[in-house]
Amino acid sequence: MKVININKIDTNREFLCENEKYKTIFFKFDEGKGFPNHTHNGYASIQVIDGIVDMKFENGETFELKCGDFLPFDARIEHNVIARVTSKVLVTIIK
């Protein structure tokens, strides 16, 4: 085990933890950037640690996520994430 200070991460993507059950990834998105439509094979969560992102699902649900917001979701539903401003998020994907 090790402590990771996310405030000291200076890359746009950093795998924080990965094992046979889940993975947690830090992402930094510039304004207007993010992920195009995609899916995963299970459930996931996103936590905004800085900035604001829009998350949209193919079923019509949309969320404006701000600093401190946490959203668990069914990642089998196609979704995308776009930053409104430079943003930092933690994404956990259950395998």
Describe the residue ranges of each PLM region.
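Glycine- and acidic-residue-biased ligand/ion/polar-headgroup-sensing regions
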Residues: G42-D54
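Ligand-binding loop in jelly-roll beta-barrel domains
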Residues: A75-K95
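A short glycine-rich, His/Asp/Glu-containing loop-to-beta-strand
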Residues: K2-K33
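Short beta-strand segments in beta-sandwich/barrel cores
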Residues: I25, G34-F35, G51-K56, F70
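Short histidine-centered beta-strand/loop micro-motifs
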Residues: F15-E18, F27, F35-H40, F57, ...
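Short acidic-glycine-tyrosine-enriched beta hairpin
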Residues: N59-A75
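A cytosolic small-molecule/anion-sensing beta-strand core signal
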Residues: I49-D50, K66, V85
